[in-house]
């Protein structure tokens, strides 16, 4: 495994076209293709998304949680996002149930 400083430099000097600060590239570098995620505060489906690149280009499975329903129309227009998104308060969800529903349990 790379040292944290080398890993940081590798990620810092790359830029993602999707996430704000390379969070997607950081996760991809650490875990590779086919990972899992829970994205709380998903926001827009593509712009500033920490999970778009992972889901669409690298076969990650997971789900998002977003309370701001005004971005739902953007998700409806983004068919490449196949993983579930829950339009709810993240503090009230039954995550164990959702993980099972989405076949994410190991």
Where are the language model's segments positioned?
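Membrane-proximal basic amphipathic "stem/tether" segments
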Residues: 1-18, 22
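SAM cofactor-binding core of SAM-dependent methyltransferases
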Residues: 15-97
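Conserved acidic residues
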Residues: 35, 105-106
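Short, structured coil/loop segments at alpha-helix boundaries
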Residues: 2, 68, 80, 103-105
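Short amphipathic alpha-helix with an adjacent loop that forms part of the alpha/beta core around
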Residues: 95-105
């Amino acid at each position: 495994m790379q040292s944290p400083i080398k890993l940081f430099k590798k990620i810092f000097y790359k830029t993602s076209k999707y996430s704000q600060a390379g969070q997607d590239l950081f996760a991809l570098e650490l875990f590779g293709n086919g990972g899992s995620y829970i994205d709380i505060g998903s926001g827009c489906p593509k712009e500033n998304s920490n999970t778009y690149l992972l889901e669409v280009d690298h076969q990650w499975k997971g789900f998002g949680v977003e309370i701001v329903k005004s971005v739902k129309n953007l998700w409806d227009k983004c068919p490449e996002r196949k993983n579930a998104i829950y339009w709810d308060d993240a503090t009230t969800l039954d995550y164990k149930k959702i993980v099972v529903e989405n076949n994410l349990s190991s």
